[in-house]
């Protein structure tokens, strides 16, 4: 049986780091308030000339280097993003060009907001298991700073920019063991950006609209449920999970999932304090951090999970 195994990871955060104290100079908030409710201390903001594709390409270069591959050995590129460079073409094709990949491999975007990397990773896994790809470049990249209302203290404190990337390679030994994706459009009003461009006009707000308490309750419930489902369907138990690598949105949501599974926070890769909610980038950012720090080791079992507007959510159980 052929598996899709992680052969390299990479991540990138823009140089401009904004602290809670910095934000307190602009809106009515404080370091204590933000930290107590979210666990966030800093977020990184892309430079004016940095696009989502720039962040994605830099994370991809680092992942390719870690995998020991050159760009033209990649035969699939998937970018998960809710903040693309353009209406079209896909950010994935722009990244392909920036990486100098000329082999004509398929490249496309997926959009499931904060669950985007789960959707992209699951899609790449299917390509590899079917024999349609041998080396897939899977990227989560966002510039959420451009869809945040910096006068709205309830949302501007939460989000940041960044990118994370994974190279998935065909392997005879286990990599991705099981994954599950879910969505329910009945909850779209809890979290969205309602604005749109049509007929040469912008209609609706271009900024994030969020029902914070509603999002919190839904996320806690669904992340616990899908974690249970993926572990059980794979024939595993929670005790066999070495690391949870969750979407980095809110420390309290992450703590709730760990508690539900009966796992200590010592088994959670936690990076939300350093970069805030980077949407589709947050899981691969945390994964790369865990691997490069030496926390995550080869052969260990990882549970990746995320949830985002839509609502869309997903989880992946894999052996690193």
From Swiss-Prot:
It comes from the Bacteria. It is found in: Cytoplasm. InterPro entries: ACP_syn_III_C, ACP_syn_III_N, FabH, Thiolase-like. Its EC number is 2.3.1.180. One of its GO terms (molecular function) is beta-ketoacyl-acyl-carrier-protein synthase III activity. Gene3D superfamilies: 3.40.47.10. The active site is at residues 114, 247, 277. GO terms for cellular component: cytoplasm. Keywords: Acyltransferase, Cytoplasm, Fatty acid biosynthesis, Fatty acid metabolism, Lipid biosynthesis, Lipid metabolism, Multifunctional enzyme, Transferase. GO terms for biological process: fatty acid biosynthetic process. Pathway: Lipid metabolism; fatty acid biosynthesis. SUPFAM superfamilies: Thiolase-like. Its main location: cytoplasm. It catalyses: malonyl-[ACP] + acetyl-CoA + H(+) = 3-oxobutanoyl-[ACP] + CO2 + CoA. Pfam families: ACP_syn_III (PF08545), ACP_syn_III_C (PF08541). Belongs to the thiolase-like superfamily. FabH family. Homodimer. Catalyzes the condensation reaction of fatty acid synthesis by the addition to an acyl acceptor of two carbons from malonyl-ACP. Catalyzes the first condensation reaction which initiates fatty acid synthesis and may therefore play a role in governing the total rate of fatty acid production. Possesses both acetoacetyl-ACP synthase and acetyl transacylase activities. Its substrate specificity determines the biosynthesis of branched-chain and/or straight-chain of fatty acids. This is Beta-ketoacyl-[acyl-carrier-protein] synthase III. The lineage of its organism: Bacteria, Pseudomonadati, Pseudomonadota, Betaproteobacteria, Neisseriales.
